[in-house]
Amino acid sequence: ADGDFDLWAKAVSYFRGRLDAEGLAGKVELVGPDAAIWGPEEAWWVSRSRDELGDRIGLYDIHTYPSKCTVNSGEYTRILEAYRREVPAGKKIVMGEIGFKFVEPADSLLQAENLRRAAAHPNASTDDSQMFVYDPMYGTDMADALFQTIHAGYSGCIAWMLDDTMHFKEAPDKLKIWGFWNIFGDEIFGAGEERVRPWYYAWSLLCRTLRPGSDFFAADVRGAAGVKAVAA
């Protein structure tokens, strides 16, 4: 809908009606508003979805690509809470996509390095790649973001993304490098690209530990600056 809420809401209402007409009422729920946000200012996407679409939305979600400084400072929690507050009672909200983009001035050196690495890589999209997936730092930052997502009251989170070969941008051989690996490394892009990247270990450990159906509790860490925690 390219930011047009009215157009999107009209499509949702039509699609919900078609599902119900096919006997799928109560069997298939719609997720929305699926908005990509950068700060708390876009929380109206959730509030308007709540007020104008009602039960046509079964599960709420947003996408976020925060800057490293936003997450590490804890500001990320406050941004997410603005959206959670707009979710109606009895409904849940999940993070439909999460990854890091160095969009804040404080992270300008990281962005410069990200662009340098992408330009030097023969198969990286220079417009849409996160080249720090090769660094352990990205794993700890993604864990930090997940903990804050939990603390903000979200019920699920999907990492962007599984495999580099899912998407390309400027050309078919210019991949959006964001994945845990590149499954076609050995065949096309170089055997080293199939190697599991460091952030996979952080994310997979959390997936195995924070099980579906768990109850989560806020954890206040004192005396250890920079350490984040969650209790389940």
Regions found by a protein language model. Give the residues of each.
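Aromatic/acidic polysaccharide-binding cleft in carbohydrate-active enzymes
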Residues: F100-A229
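Residue-level signal for functionally critical sites in structured catalytic/ligand-binding pockets
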Residues: A1-D4, W8, L24, G58, ...
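Noncatalytic carbohydrate-binding groove/subsite architecture in carbohydrate-active enzymes
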Residues: G3-A152
